[in-house]
Amino acid sequence: MNNLFPFLALNKIALQLGPLAIHWYAIFIVGGAALAVWLACKEAPKRNIKTDDIIDFVLFAFPLGIVGARLYYVIFQWSYYSQHPSQIIAMWDGGGAIYGSLIAGAIVLFVFSYYRMIHPLDLLDITIPGVFLAQAMGRWGNFVNQEAYGKIVSNLDWLPAFIRNQMFIDGHYRMPTFLFESIGTLSGFILVMVFRHRIKGLKRGDIFSFYLVWYGAVRFIVEGMRTDSLMLGPARVSQWLSVLLVIVGLVLFIYRRMKKN
């Protein structure tokens, strides 16, 4: 049956401590990052990388990744933020882009790898499982903020009531595209964790290549269903970037097998 109480949406604030408001969005982001660090620290010794290097990398990459996510979003919504500059830093209300975070994180990773004399593909292979998991969790922050949704649908009877309630936006039920992407990235995480030490012949960078192809494909499909995509003219920016990710992932995978040394 249809949800009889669509107004029972979740509060964006999880906990209020006097003037300090702790948002669900922040909890999912920080929680995902913490799990990603834990996973990377467990894997690092197997690649002869110190856990201290992982911690140091995260201390640089995490804050700059958040800045990158926000900056990317603001750039493509400049028509709004140019008129409301005070809202530029209000990320607690939502408004971050995963691709912006990935771009910033990649820059930090390559610079960090150079100065610590760590092969960047080793560091990427170590961190990718955590990135998958953090992305899967982060989409639930979008869920609470009522972001990353799709077209209007007549009902969502196939979903639990708490999701139906939150997907009732502006008087209509919306397709929960956040959920599709969360499931897609969680599936990628499970596949990597199950097979990365079971498949013989994996080369340095293969896990990273898999991430680029898998996430690029998932994001391309999901982005096509969203109605709040960041646009550049008539084009969905994230779909173009998704195609680029798939191409780079395939090229890297093939190149690593053609390279003799």
Swiss-Prot record:
Name this polypeptide is given: Phosphatidylglycerol--prolipoprotein diacylglyceryl transferase
Taxonomic lineage of the native organism: Bacteria, Bacillati, Bacillota, Bacilli, Lactobacillales
Stated role: Catalyzes the transfer of the diacylglyceryl group from phosphatidylglycerol to the sulfhydryl group of the N-terminal cysteine of a prolipoprotein, the first step in the formation of mature lipoproteins.
Entry's Gene Ontology molecular function annotations: phosphatidylglycerol-prolipoprotein diacylglyceryl transferase activity
Record flagged with keyword Mitochondrion: no
Cellular component, GO, one term: plasma membrane
Spans through the membrane: 20-40, 54-74, 94-114, 175-195, 205-225, 235-255
Residues that, per the record, bind a 1,2-diacyl-sn-glycero-3-phospho-(1'-sn-glycerol): R139
Topology with respect to the bilayer: Multi-pass membrane protein
Keywords from the named record: Cell membrane, Membrane, Transferase, Transmembrane, Transmembrane helix
InterPro entries named among the record's database cross-references: Lgt
Localization, UniProt: Cell membrane
Family: Belongs to the Lgt family.
Pathway given in the UniProt record: Protein modification; lipoprotein biosynthesis (diacylglyceryl transfer)
GO annotation terms (biological process): lipoprotein biosynthetic process
Superkingdom assignment: Bacteria
Predominant location: membrane
The keyword Repressor is assigned to this record: no
